[in-house]
């Protein structure tokens, strides 16, 4: 990924990967519409006899970490099949730059399942002394930065130490460090990364006519700094793009009596998974496949990905088509953790081995 420029066509193909995780099978229609040279390469590879999932797995390389990044911090159980293809979806906070959303979309072509794993952003990362020493050299006052041990700040630390000198598999110290932390702590290898801003969610939801969902409680919150205003009533309703963004971002506000209410990161992750499930169940159908084509150009500026060429895109297309054809099973996994106070900062502590 890094800083290299991508052509508009490649960006469109990258977007296919995001939508393949949500709307499996769309690529089959896409290849019949776009007709420039890179897409012909995409088509040629898509219909080659190679297995897309096997090709993606063959691109895997060892993490080659300089040392253990954590103090033997390991989640207590396995989250995915070792042969699953795992795409990390990143959604940033538009004001702070921290990662507001970290979601793993795990595609298991052998067991025909798509698993969504939302990683709570407040998870405490128990960094190793080796890493802390390197961090102190690069950033002497890092310890004074509040919440720096949260997983949603991992990319900041990766950038500070110039992790792997920008020569890791994603060619980006922020993404490489975050991916290696996830692999070390959760034993989930990240095959590719998709960086998507909240504004993209608005456009996708509006284009498909909204998402019907049962909102569990009043969501009312206002933050002028983030240009964020959430006002969603409790109950079954269809959310447009703006409210859909508010639904997945909501974490605190006021209740029906005007009193302060906080649902915490774990509850917010449950809402996000519920939203994704609702979107898939309502819009994963043949009649909606054609809609994807017309929104590519409008969304590509909001999305970046480690999948940057037609051949890689078509490998995901094969996986998506296979899962869709076999009527895949959709699952979700909640990360088990508990609230803790560490030096006056709120964190979530993982259940460990």
Q: Where are the predicted features?
A:
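Non-catalytic, solvent-exposed segments at the cell envelope interface
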Residues: 2, 27-353
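Hydrophobic membrane-insertion alpha-helices, especially the h-region
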Residues: 14-28
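N-terminal Lys/Arg-rich, disordered targeting/topogenic segments
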Residues: 1-12
């Amino acid at each position: 990924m890094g800083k290299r420029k991508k052509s508009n066509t490649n960006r469109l193909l990258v977007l296919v990967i995001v939508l393949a995780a949500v709307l499996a099978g769309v690529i089959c229609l896409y290849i019949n519409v776009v007709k420039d040279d890179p897409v012909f390469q995409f088509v040629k590879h898509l219909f080659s006899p190679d297995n897309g999932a096997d090709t993606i797995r063959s691109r895997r390389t060892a993490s080659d970490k300089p040392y253990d990044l954590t103090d033997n911090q390991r989640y207590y159980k396995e989250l995915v099949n070792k042969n699953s293809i795992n795409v990390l979806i990143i959604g940033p906070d538009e004001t702070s730059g921290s990662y507001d959303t970290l979601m793993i979309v795990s595609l298991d072509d052998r067991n025909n399942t798509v698993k969504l794993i939302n990683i709570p952003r407040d998870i405490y990362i128990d960094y190793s002394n080796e890493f802390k020493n390197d961090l102190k050299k690069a950033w002497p006052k890092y310890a004074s930065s509040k919440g720096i041990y949260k997983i949603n700040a991992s990319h900041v630390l990766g950038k500070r130490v110039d992790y792997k000198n920008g020569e890791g598999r994603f060619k980006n110290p922020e993404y490489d460090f975050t991916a290696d932390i996830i692999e070390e702590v959760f034993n989930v290898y990240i095959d590719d990364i998709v960086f998507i801003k909240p504004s993209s969610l608005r456009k996708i939801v509006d284009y498909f006519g909204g998402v019907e969902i049962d909102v569990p409680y009043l969501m009312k919150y206002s933050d002028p700094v983030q240009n964020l205003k959430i006002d969603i009533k409790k109950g079954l309703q269809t959310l447009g793009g703006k409210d859909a963004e508010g639904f997945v971002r909501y974490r605190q506000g006021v209740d029906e009596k005007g009193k302060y209410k906080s649902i915490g990161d774990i509850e917010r992750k449950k809402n996000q998974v519920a939203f994704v499930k609702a979107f898939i169940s309502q819009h994963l159908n043949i009649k909606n496949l054609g809609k994807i084509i017309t929104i590519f150009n409008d969304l590509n500026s909001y999305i970046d990905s480690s999948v940057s060429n037609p051949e890689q895109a078509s490998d995901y297309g094969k996986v998506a088509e296979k899962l869709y054809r076999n009527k895949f099973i959709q699952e979700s996994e909640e990360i088990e953790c508990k609230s803790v106070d560490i030096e006056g900062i709120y964190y979530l502590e993982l259940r460990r081995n």
